[in-house]
């Protein structure tokens, strides 16, 4: 259960949940993290009356969720898990977008089997007529391309509640194709809802081969522009075909981004026990080949994967790196962070303290260590999945915009190392919104591609703006790179009218025309 930091306020002890698990632990205290999100959403609400737990409990009861002050405290401290219905009621009472809080638990619950079903989705009765009727409606919406993110999430819940449901092969294929092709265009809340749907569908044995086929077909398109998101589903699919695809991504990646995705997927599948002995052997050979080709780069790029390998192989590689003077690999493998703990803690604390001061409401709790912990994980954790989940949690909290403000301020400091600045930029991509548009544009020509690329992608997650659209179009270069590909991403995701002109142009470079045509076939971003 989550540790809690307390302070006395209005005659009661207010508990702020904290995940006390070690940074390098294989699992986190999900209940504490959800409890923190609940309490911060309430305590930083614009209605000051909600800071009184008794008032808020009464508001939940008025909205149809009978709740005591004691139960509220236990939810928010992480002592007991909250039901999905109660989280949805939190959202209604606080006036938050539907899914702002609950989609996080649906997302996490779909990827962590130990999470109780009642936390991850609403209560469903697969034996009832209403369930069957609604399932039919959701399938029709999805097959016809009319399903919104909320519909997909609900479809995922229904299929996970009835994993033995019989559907025609053509129906499974249509659902898989639609999910795989739509997922790369989702952002923010829609991303969490679509992803939760995909993860739940992946739990259905009958669906797994269709999902792998859809991913393989999608990735085989020579003009494909976004590969990480749909390919990321492979770690949920314990099939031989999925394992082979992951190993291919590590061995023969089309670019550095694909390689990084492959390393993450291989590490995840290794941890889940998805590889056969023969696949283990192939993975070992790939790692050794990469190591011999460039030991210095391999010790950096493969740290996440090496950390999860059997002790013999892991120890051999760490020893070799240490003997060659590259001690960082041993530290990263042992401690779970890419930089020294004191440095990670200091930077995260600095950012969290600044961000908290920027949030308008100032509830009187003494200390919140969870935000610091989440910022630290999002920026510096060795494991991609852990960083990703921490970033999503911050983005759903009242601190997302403020943390992005502070990150952008720190990013402007050129004294930071390029690696640190790339991590700052990556987290900004998760958290930025319309208020950050001009500052994102200011980094369009940053000298480091790993910095400007995620920031340009962040522009693509915002609605179309004539200003940024013209600036991005004018800055397009002739030669393909990750940064230039990101500019096409930004134009396409925002629905730029210039995309059609690029596709038709006889003067535009071939890679731009190919990218524009691919995006025309996909469509712009999905926010709902």
Regions found by a protein language model. Name each.
Residues 47-74:
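Short alpha-helical DNA-recognition segment
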Residues 79, 83-101:
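DNA major-groove recognition helix of helix-turn-helix/homeodomain DNA-binding modules
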Residues 153-167, 189-206, 227-237, 259-274, ...:
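Structural detector for internal amphipathic alpha-helices that build alpha-solenoid repeat scaffolds
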Residues 192-200, 209-232, 241-264, 278-289, ...:
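Extended alpha-solenoid helical-repeat scaffolds
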Residues 109-212, 225-231, 242, 463-464, ...:
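Short juxta-domain linker segments that transition from a proline/glycine-rich
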Residues 169-184, 206-218, 239-251, 272-290, ...:
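Amphipathic alpha-helical scaffolding segments comprising HEAT/armadillo-like alpha-solenoid repeats
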Residues 1-54:
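A short, Lys/Arg-rich alpha-helix, primarily the initiator
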Residues 187-188, 219-223, 251-258, 290-295, ...:
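Short inter-helical turns and helix N-cap capping residues of alpha-solenoid HEAT/ARM repeat scaffolds
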């Amino acid at each position: 259960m989550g540790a809690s930091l307390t302070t006395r306020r209005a005659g009661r002890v207010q508990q702020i949940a904290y995940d006390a698990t070690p940074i390098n632990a294989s699992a986190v205290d999900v209940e504490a993290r959800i409890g923190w999100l609940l309490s911060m959403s309430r305590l930083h609400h614009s209605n000051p009356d909600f800071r009184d737990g008794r008032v808020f409990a009464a508001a939940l009861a008025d909205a149809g969720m009978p709740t005591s002050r004691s139960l509220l405290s236990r939810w928010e401290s992480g002592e007991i898990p909250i039901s999905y219905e109660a989280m949805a009621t939190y959202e209604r009472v606080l006036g938050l977008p539907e899914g702002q809080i609950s989609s996080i638990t649906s997302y996490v619950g779909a990827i962590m089997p130990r999470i109780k079903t009642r936390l991850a989705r609403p209560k469903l009765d697969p034996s009832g007529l209403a369930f069957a009727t609604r399932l039919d409606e959701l399938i029709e919406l999805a097959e016809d391309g009319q399903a919104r993110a909320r519909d997909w999430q609900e479809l995922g819940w229904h299929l996970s509640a009835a994993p033995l449901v019989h559907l025609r092969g053509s129906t499974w294929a249509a659902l898989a194709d639609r999910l795989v092709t739509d997922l790369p265009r989702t952002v923010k809340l829609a991303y969490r809802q679509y992803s939760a749907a995909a993860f739940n569908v992946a739990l259905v044995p009958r669906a797994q081969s269709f999902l792998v086929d859809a991913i393989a077909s999608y990735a085989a398109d020579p003009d494909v522009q976004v590969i990480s998101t749909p390919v990321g589903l492979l770690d949920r699919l314990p099939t031989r075909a999925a394992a082979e695809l992951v190993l291919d991504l590590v061995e023969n990646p089309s670019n550095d981004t694909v390689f990084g995705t492959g390393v993450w997927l291989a590490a995840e599948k290794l941890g889940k026990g998805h590889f056969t002995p023969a696949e283990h052997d192939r993975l070992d050979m790939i790692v050794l080949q990469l190591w011999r080709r460039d030991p210095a780069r391999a010790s950096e790029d493969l740290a996440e994967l090496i950390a999860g390998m059997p002790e013999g192989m892991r120890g051999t590689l760490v020893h070799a790196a240490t003997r060659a003077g590259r001690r960082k690999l041993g530290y990263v493998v042992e401690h779970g962070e890419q930089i020294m703990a004191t440095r990670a803690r200091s930077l995260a604390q600095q950012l969290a303290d600044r961000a908290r001061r920027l949030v308008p409401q100032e509830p009187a709790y003494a200390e919140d260590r969870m935000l610091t912990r989440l910022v630290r994980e999002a920026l510096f954790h060795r494991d991609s999945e852990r960083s990703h989940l921490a970033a999503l949690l911050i983005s759903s909290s009242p601190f997302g915009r403020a943390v992005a403000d502070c990150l952008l301020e720190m990013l402007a400091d050129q004294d930071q190392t390029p690696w640190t600045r790339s991590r700052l930029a990556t987290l900004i991509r998760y958290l930025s919104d319309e208020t950050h548009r001009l500052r994102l544009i200011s980094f369009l020509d940053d000298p480091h591609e790993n910095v400007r690329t995620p920031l340009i992608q962040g522009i693509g997650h915002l609605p179309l703006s004539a200003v940024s659209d013209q600036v991005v179009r004018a800055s397009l270069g002739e030669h393909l790179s990750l940064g230039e590909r990101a500019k096409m991403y930004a134009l396409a995701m925002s629905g730029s009218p210039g995309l059609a002109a690029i596709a038709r142009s006889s003067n535009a470079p071939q890679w731009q025309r190919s990218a524009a045509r691919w995006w025309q076939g996909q469509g712009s971003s999905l926010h709902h």
